C-alpha cells in the first residue's frame, strides 16, 4: 500500500488533484486476537492515511479510509469463521444492528468518499460496522469462546491454508 500510494501520489501531486482511498479494518485501532499481522499492517495504513492528509492537502489531494467491521469474505472467513461452528451468529450478536455488513454498503461508502460531494473530508477514517466497535470491538476476539473441539478443527483448517 505504501509503495502504491507513493507512486500514484507523484502523479496526483503533479496534477494537483486526487483522492486516495484506503481500506483498513476496525481492529486497526482496537486490536483483535488471532489477526495480529493484519492488525499491525492496517494500523500502519491508517497512520499513513492521516499523515498524508496533512502533507498532501496543499496539492489538492485528499486521503481517506474506510474501516469495515465484519463483512463476510471468502478469504478470512473461510479460515476464521468457517460454517458450522456458530462463530457468525456470535459475531452478529455483538453488533447492535444484529447483522453483518453487505458489500454494496461498503461500495456505496467508497463511492461517496471519492466523490466531489465529499470534497471537504480529508484524513478521515470512516467506520462501517453496524456499531460493533462501540461495544468493544475486535470481531475475532470471540474465537476464544468457541468449544475446544471446534477450536482444534479451526486450527487444523488454518494450518492447511498455509
Positions of PLM-derived features:
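C-terminal substrate-recognition "lid" of short-chain dehydrogenase/reductases
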Residues: 2-5, 62, 99-128, 133-134
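Active-site helix of classical SDR
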Residues: 5, 41, 49
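Alpha-helical segment proximal to the catalytic Tyr-Lys
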Residues: 10, 54-58, 119
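Residue(s) in the substrate-gating loop at a strand-loop-helix junction
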Residues: 25
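Short, flexible catalytic-loop segment of classical short-chain dehydrogenase/reductase
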Residues: 29, 67-78
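Active-site loop immediately N-terminal to the catalytic Tyr-X3-Lys motif
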Residues: 30-36, 58-59, 98, 116
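Active-site loop-to-helix junction immediately N-terminal to the catalytic Tyr of the SDR YXXXK motif
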Residues: 31-40, 51, 76-79
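Short C-terminal tail/terminal secondary-structure segment
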Residues: 111, 122-162
Amino acid at each position: 500500500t505504501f509503495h502504491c500510494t507513493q507512486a500514484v501520489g507523484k502523479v496526483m501531486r503533479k496534477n494537483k488533484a486526487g483522492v486516495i482511498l484506503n481500506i483498513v479494518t476496525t481492529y486497526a485501532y482496537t486490536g483483535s486476537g488471532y489477526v495480529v499481522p493484519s492488525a499491525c499492517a492496517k494500523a500502519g495504513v491508517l497512520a499513513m492515511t492521516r499523515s498524508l492528509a496533512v502533507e498532501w492537502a496543499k496539492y489538492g489531494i485528499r486521503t481517506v479510509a474506510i474501516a469495515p467491521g465484519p463483512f463476510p469474505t471468502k478469504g478470512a472467513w473461510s479460515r476464521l469463521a468457517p460454517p458450522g461452528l456458530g462463530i457468525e451468529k456470535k459475531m452478529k450478536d455483538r453488533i447492535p444492528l444484529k447483522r453483518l455488513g453487505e458489500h454494496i454498503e461498503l461500495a456505496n461508502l467508497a463511492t461517496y468518499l471519492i466523490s466531489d460531494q465529499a470534497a471537504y473530508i480529508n484524513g478521515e477514517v470512516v467506520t462501517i460496522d453496524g456499531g460493533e466497535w462501540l461495544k468493544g470491538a475486535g470481531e475475532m476476539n470471540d474465537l476464544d469462546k468457541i468449544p475446544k473441539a471446534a477450536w482444534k478443527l479451526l486450527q487444523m483448517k488454518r494450518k492447511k491454508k498455509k
